[in-house]
Swiss-Prot record:
Name this protein carries in UniProt: Cycloamanide C
Highest taxon in the source lineage: Eukaryota
Modification after translation: Processed by the macrocyclase-peptidase enzyme POPB to yield a cyclic octapeptide. POPB first removes 10 residues from the N-terminus. Conformational trapping of the remaining peptide forces the enzyme to release this intermediate rather than proceed to macrocyclization. The enzyme rebinds the remaining peptide in a different conformation and catalyzes macrocyclization of the N-terminal 8 residues.
Cross-link Cyclopeptide (Met-Pro): where in chain: 1-8
Molecular-function GO term, any one: toxin activity
Source organism of this protein record: Amanita phalloides (Death cap)
Amino acid sequence: MLGFLVLP
């Protein structure tokens, strides 16, 4: 869900 983090 978050492009700048590991989360999608």
